[in-house]
């Protein structure tokens, strides 16, 4: 018997390089991991916080995206194991809230960076840093007018704690 009052569900590789190595495992981690943790939250009446992602918006046609935006997604693309996995995980969270009264929180993370970030994880910050350190040209995809939201890891943790301790239960 496990006694907990808060569950912090942060499991799932977030680096494209990592989640594309085993896309089936990535999707299973999002779905089954969330399902199992929500079951535990329901059994022990624990608050539940799930780390989701900005990737639930897919390739958004609206910038910046409000939480009410439903996105523009590709359910069968090479990134879909991560994007769709997080979308179904959010759906499960909201269904457990509606059907079982679970006390859930969903944090949609955008481009976190900080110490011990792997230099080859395939995300923009690490790519920029590695290229700059090698005195290489910085790779910009598109025409350079794109925008991204970045969050320092310590700020993200502070946000998680504030969200878990709040009464806010929407993404």
State the predicted function of each range.
Residues 1-112, 132, 142, 153-167:
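N-terminal Rossmann-like NAD(P)+-binding domain of SDR-like oxidoreductases, especially those catalyzing
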Residues 21-22, 116-121:
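Short, solvent-exposed loop/turn segments at secondary-structure boundaries
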Residues 29-32, 123, 127:
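A general alpha-helical scaffold signature found inside nucleotide-binding enzyme cores
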Residues 106-109, 121-126, 137, 144, ...:
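Conserved loop-to-helix N-cap of the C-terminal "lid" that shapes the substrate pocket in Rossmann-like
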Residues 127-133:
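Activation segment of eukaryotic-like protein kinases
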Residues 170-171:
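A glycine-biased structural micro-motif
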